[in-house]
Amino acid sequence: LGIDSSQIVNQLTGASNKAAKQATSIFSGMGKKIAAGLSIAAFTKFTKDCLEVGSNVTEVQNVVDTAFKDLSGQADQWASNAMTNFGLSKLSAKKYMGVFGQMSNAMGITGQAALDMAEDVTGLTGDVASFYNRGTDEVYTKLKSIWTGETETLKDLGVVMTQTNLDQYALNNGFGKTTAKMTEQEKVMLRYQYVTSALSNATGDFVKTQDSWANQTRILSLRFEQLKASLGK
């Protein structure tokens, strides 16, 4: 497109960290550069994408507010740092946290415990995606198995969560009983600890490999997504 990529990255970085009003003024300058290299159809699609992302922000926020209630502010603050810590856009982080939180609520896990669990598994989603070079949505879907108990999806991540393995882990880690004698809530907590332990090698991978080409490309894409979210509000 004949656009200075370093200049675009700097503009995207600024836009993703400012309020919607400031993002609009930034877009007025950057948008001219983008528009100069895009067809009318492509620019129309960009505008449509902004509106769709903006709509998703509202829907995701509603789920977060419902799942965490008066703790939703903590969730928002955590998600604001998810890009640099885990390679997740704020929107994706809140989406994952909201769903994980709702699933925990359904199992009787609420309040701070539900939020802590959602943050841990959402962060793990970003790290595992970086470790295995997979899409974050794919990893997010697989990690739902912590709540659902599905085992096949986790094998792609090197986690073999058989009944035998879970029972042995429970006896070795202070649960004092096997899954046959556990409540559904206890089973969720067991799977949570088992999976996070099994994926411990991936923990912190995004930060460790942040300068890699794959992760730098991911960050650029995430900044562009956040710009769309700001413009679409």
Where are these regions (language model features)?
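Small-residue helix-packing and pore-constriction motifs in hydrophobic alpha-helices
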Residues: 35-87, 98-109, 116-129, 138-212, ...
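Intrinsically disordered, low-complexity regions
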Residues: 5-9, 23, 151, 192, ...
